[in-house]
Design a protein with these regions (language model features):
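Flexible loop and strand-edge segments within Gram-negative outer membrane beta-barrel domains
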Residues: 317-321, 330-343, 349, 354-401, ...
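Extracytoplasmic beta-strand/coil segments of soluble accessory domains associated
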Residues: 174, 178-218
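C-terminal beta-signal and adjacent terminal beta-strands/loops
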Residues: 646, 697-704, 712, 723-769
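Membrane-embedded beta-barrel scaffold of Gram-negative outer-membrane proteins
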Residues: 404-420, 541-546, 570-626, 631-635
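Gram-negative outer-membrane beta-barrel transporters
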Residues: 451, 456, 493-496, 592-600, ...
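A beta-strand signature from Gram-negative outer-membrane beta-barrel systems
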Residues: 231-279
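Short, acidic, small-residue-rich periplasmic hinge/interaction motif at the N-terminus
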Residues: 129-166, 174, 204
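Surface-exposed extracellular loop regions of Gram-negative outer-membrane beta-barrel proteins
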Residues: 506-508, 515-521, 529-576, 596-620, ...
């Protein structure tokens, strides 16, 4: 699949391949050059023309999503004078006809005769080789491997682009993350339900969410609600575990796990004569869900780009669910779950010879009613939450042969207004207002001493302040200074990366006790070895160790009655051993990864939700997590312009409490962490209609550390189906898609007493111009 997200089966350019001419007197030879693949069957490529005798040599394009390092398609025309399977030195090469000097020695008639003879010989070879199909020349198909970052990286990297969203039947951001190995999504159900991500049992607070490379901070809660990001407004989602794959990056991005959300404006600048392009989309789904969106990009030159995007989302979320309790079982509908969201973005990019500047501004507004837990068949609730966020960020990058550097700045403002209209049963104050402001600065530089050794330094500074109408958090702030020193060494098949991080935190709370200040040093090391480097098979072995450190959030420290300034910071130790393999034989390609890990968490902070807005926090002492992550991605081209795409993953997590050996909870699985989980999807792509079947599943879980029958969450599996098609209309493209979610109408819960939606449909239309 192309990294750009285009459908290689349905969206193909029809540019001609013939662009260069070689003149030999009256005989003109066409040289094939790299271009876009043509629709339908491979087109005839006229390569030689001499008078009235025209020799047609057909060149077929072998589409291989693993061939081109830049994400496109490597096009290798067939040359009968080359050995089969031997690639030429460049994508376009002239046929080995007699030298031009030799042709000059012949008269015009002789040259024409030579051309006719060559044409007859090639025509005879053509007819003998193609007895079954007289319209197709036998071709030599060369299959090579494209180097994926995920296969050669020292750390586990999983990435999905917009094409993968279609091929896997993904409908929202939470669904996309649920398809990644090692990820546990805590989902409160419905389009308006909060969705947070825990990776390898470490908790959501250890997962850093970045947008176009810069972190999305929420120091108040310590975790980011991924439901606010519209899947249609993302070009890719990337998960990096253990460490960051690149040597030079903001220090914030060196968290235990990083979810990087990539906007379409982060894609490479276009090199064409179309200065104006954009998209208009509409998504409609069950339970009165509407989601129109639009984006527009103006590119007056190949170095300048300005863009804007906006989307609006509305859903009643009054989906039906089933409560089972013997003869008292009932069919109910979710209440108080309506949600309305509006979001706008502005982007500007300027590129120079060695540098680039990218600036962005965003505003987000969300008003939703918070559905309560279903207790004794009562699911009504009177809570509401209004959230607003505005941020502006700018990032500058510079690079030459020996040096590279970056600098970035970001200002983030957030407002949350929580209301509970039933004051008789409200937990805490019935009206709570929070204002969060953050100033974030980061810079770094890398020196490449040779092709083998590089050294990088980066530093971050952040000032975060929180104010509210509650006495406990009326005015609190934190200053954070992070530094990292990194070194990498490459020699042949071996790659080694070393890092050292310094964390400094200063907490402030005028007139009251503040949380303790902290200074910590944490190391990280990762390595990879290319065990096999053949043409059709590459195998890498990798290993890594890292210590990660995080402070308690403001809610964990200061929230009235539930927060505590005595909470201790978390320190995690991660160990990873992995294997990656990539192979391609003919029409079949495969990418396989397997990673075994062992994590130790000291003084783990566990947030147990009372509802969508109020949390309880405690230190568990020590937690040990052992697990295995397996991923498989394979494609099979079954016919011209048709392929099967299979993607699957499996995760094994044994996350146990090891705090007190005499406690009743010693050795129990952590809350909401399934021991077995996985996902799979199978797509059949054709030029007429593409079909997808997908499933996600998880084993038994518990809502608390006490493993009681009342706290058990049964295992579940959810199936879905999708169909989509694209129409290319000149420079425009129309994409239509239909999804059937939870096709078998299963009733299940991910968070206890928050039922998930049952069978539902989703329709979408996207116009690209």
């Amino acid at each position: 699949m192309r990294e750009t997200g285009e459908n290689p089966v349905q969206s193909r350019c029809c540019k001609p391949f013939l662009t260069a001419w070689y003149h030999f007197g009256h005989c003109e030879l066409h040289q094939p050059r790299e271009g876009g693949p043509c629709k339908g069957k491979p087109e005839n490529l006229p390569l030689a023309r001499a008078g009235n005798a025209i020799v047609a040599l057909h060149a077929r394009i072998r589409f291989n999503p693993l061939t081109n390092p830049r994400g496109g398609v490597q096009r290798i025309p067939f040359n009968p004078l080359y050995e089969a399977g031997t690639p030429p030195s460049c994508p376009g090469f002239p046929l080995l006809f007699p030298k031009k000097t030799f042709m000059k020695l012949l008269s015009f008639k002789a040259r024409r005769a030579v051309a006719v003879v060559i044409g007859l010989v090639l025509g005879a070879m053509y007819a003998a080789a193609q007895k079954l199909d007289p319209d197709t020349l036998r071709t030599a198909e060369v299959t090579t491997l494209r180097k994926h970052e995920s296969i050669s990286a020292n750390v586990p990297v999983q990435r999905m682009d917009s094409m993968a969203f279609k091929q896997r039947g993904i409908t929202d951001t939470g669904d996309a993350l649920r398809r990644l190995a090692g990820v546990t999504v805590r989902d409160y159900g419905g389009a308006g339900g909060m969705k947070t991500v825990s990776v390898r049992g470490l908790g959501a607070a250890h997962t850093m969410v970045t947008y176009d490379g810069l972190g999305m901070s929420d120091v108040r809660n310590g975790q980011t609600d991924l439901q606010r990001f519209n899947i249609d407004a993302l070009a890719a989602i990337e998960l990096q575990t253990l460490d960051y794959a690149r040597l030079l990056c903001p220090v914030r991005n060196l968290a235990a796990a990083v979810v990087n959300l990539v906007s379409p404006f982060e894609q490479p600048l276009r090199s064409g004569k179309q200065p104006l392009h954009g998209t208009v989309s509409l998504r409609q789904a069950a339970f009165n869900t509407w989601n129109p969106a639009a984006s527009l990009t103006v590119q007056p030159s190949e170095r300048t780009q300005v863009g804007a995007a906006a989307n609006w989302f509305y859903a009643d979320n009054n989906y039906p669910f089933y409560v089972e309790n013997g003869v008292a079982s009932e069919h109910l509908r979710r209440a108080n779950s309506r949600m309305q969201t509006a979001q706008t973005e502005l982007h500007a990019r300027q590129r120079w010879t060695h540098s680039q500047l990218h600036a962005a501004a965003s505003f987000y507004h969300n008003h939703r009613r918070l559905p309560g837990p279903v207790v004794l068949y009562v699911n009504d609730n009177n809570e509401q939450l209004t959230e607003q966020q505005a941020f502006g960020q700018a990032r500058w990058t510079w690079q030459n042969k020996a040096w590279s550097a970056f600098a970035a700045a970001k200002y983030d403002w957030q407002k949350s207004h929580y209301t509970h209209h039933n004051t008789a049963i409200a937990v805490g104050a019935p009206r709570q207002k929070y204002y969060q402001r953050e100033v974030y600065l980061t810079a770094g530089m890398q020196r490449n001493f040779s092709h083998h050794i590089a050294l990088a330094y980066a530093t971050d500074y952040a000032h975060t302040a929180l104010s509210s109408n509650l006495p406990a958090t009326k005015r609190v702030s934190r200053d954070t200074w992070l530094q990292s020193l990194s070194a990498s060494w490459h020699a042949g098949p071996v790659s080694l990366t070393l890092r050292g991080l310094c964390h400094l935190y200063a907490n402030h709370r005028p007139g009251a006790e503040a949380a303790d200040n902290e200074v910590r040093l944490t190391p990280a090391v990762s390595a990879s070895v290319r065990a096999v480097g053949q043409r059709h098979l590459r195998v890498f072995l990798r290993a890594g160790y890292k210590e990660a450190f995080r402070m308690p959030s403001f809610t964990e420290n200061y929230y009235h009655h539930l927060g505590s300034t005595d909470l201790k910071p978390e320190l995690t130790r991660q160990t990873n051993l992995g294997l990656t393999a990539q192979t391609a034989y003919g029409p079949w390609q495969m990418l396989l990864t397997a990673d075994a890990y062992y994590n130790q968490v000291e003084q783990r902070i566990v947030s147990i939700p009372y509802n969508l807005f109020v949390w309880r926090t405690v230190n568990l002492g020590e937690v040990r997590v052992g697990g295995l992550d397996l991923t498989l991605h394979t494609t099979l081209r079954v016919a011209p312009r048709q392929q099967l795409v299979l993607t699957t993953n499996y995760s094994l997590q044994r996350a146990a409490d090891r705090s007190v050996s005499t406690a009743a909870t010693y050795g129990n699985q952590l809350p909401y962490t399934p021991r077995h989980s996985g996902a799979a999807s199978l797509a059949w792509e054709t030029p007429w209609l593409s079909l997808v079947a997908h499933t996600t599943w998880a084993s038994e879980r518990w809502s608390t550390l006490e493993h009681l029958p009342a706290t058990s969450l049964p295992r579940y599996s959810e199936w879905g189906f999708a169909a989509y098609r694209s129409w290319q209309l000149g420079r425009h493209r129309l994409d239509l898609r239909a999804d059937l979610v939870n096709a078998f109408n299963r009733s299940y819960e991910i968070v206890r007493r928050y039922p998930m939606p049952r069978r539902a449909y989703k329709l979408s239309a996207v116009w690209t111009f």
